[in-house]
UniProtKB/Swiss-Prot annotation:
Organism in which the protein naturally occurs: Streptomyces avermitilis (strain ATCC 31267 / DSM 46492 / JCM 5070 / NBRC 14893 / NCIMB 12804 / NRRL 8165 / MA-4680)
Alphabetical list of InterPro entries matching this protein: GCL_type2/YbdK_subfam (IPR050141), GCS2 (IPR006336), Gln_synth/guanido_kin_cat_dom (IPR014746), YbdK (IPR011793)
Disulphide bond pairs: none
Top-rank taxon, per record: Bacteria
Enzyme class: ligase
Function: ATP-dependent carboxylate-amine ligase which exhibits weak glutamate--cysteine ligase activity.
Record-given protein name: Putative glutamate--cysteine ligase 2-2
The UniProt record lists the keyword Mitochondrion: no
Catalytic activity of the protein: L-cysteine + L-glutamate + ATP = gamma-L-glutamyl-L-cysteine + ADP + phosphate + H(+)
Amino acid sequence: MSLYTVGVEEEYLLLDPATRLPMPAAEQVRAAAGLEPIAGEDEIQPELSEAQVEVATPVCTSLDEIGGHLVRLRHVLGRAAESNGCRLAACGTPPIKEESPPPLTNNPRYRAMRAQAPQLVAEQLVCGTHVHVGVPDPEIGVAVLNRIRLWLPVLVAMSANSPFWAGHDTGFASWRTVIFGRWPVSGPPPHFADLADHEKRVQQLLTCGVIFDPGQLYWQARLSSRYPTVEVRCLDVQLRADDAVMFAGIVRALVATAINDAKAGVPVPSCPPELLQGANWHAARHGLSGSLIDYEGRRRSAGDVLSQLMDHIGPALDAADDSREVASLVHRLLREGTPADRQRRALLRGGLRAVTDLIITESAVT
């Protein structure tokens, strides 16, 4: 089994340490971080809002590399944020926010998005983790999408880290998933007949003007328009860097398993789009706190579905020598709950102040 390359992008909020509101200081933080000798110029990037920043690891071959880069980048950004009077926050949505959004980053594409959908952009203050896995060619990439799409609701549930919005509990474990689902091309990707079918359908979306560039394909998994990768985008950003490492290992193993199954002629399990969409909504609503709906439409315990996932990707994890690390982190997740669960426990202890204390503390790398 080939060892596929992997890279991770993480988006963070910047919070005012006094008010805990999103703080529009991205330009200053990025400038300060760029002065650090251990941060590359392309590794720290702007995001839609001036209260957000994004980091991108180099292309890696091991989870140790991914973890080292994420810790390094969180450390650099954390120092830069503190030097500019704010704090780094690895949460999918801001627990507290003002009615008016932070300023938009000065970028022509972002301005075009605001003109296209003003209210959606105003509420797009969300942060995710994106995992890129290298694939040999786009045709194989489409075959991968057809197979991993069935597992995206499980990843949504596992990564849930956005229960609060504008000072209240949304009732969802991943409110970020709901926010992203309002865009015209979003949620789990459809099944494609082949690469030509994929290209035809994307071109139709561009031609009719529903999207104005491939970057607006907000499917939860897609072919990257910039890199020779499959990009999984359904994950909320993680409180802890090692949980992002866990997801990098899981996603790479899903891609490797999909490639091997496609080459072996293993049939793609069927799943009606409405069932997959419903399973995705259910995962965003409940996280791992109860049941999940699998791609056969069965309501099962979250633990059983995670066990099925680990069995499915087990050989790929073994081949990459990732089994022990990923299994240990999955067991911790089941024991402690999702970041959304942990945020809610903090709320019971000390209100929203305790929630943001948890987020700031866990996001920091000391």
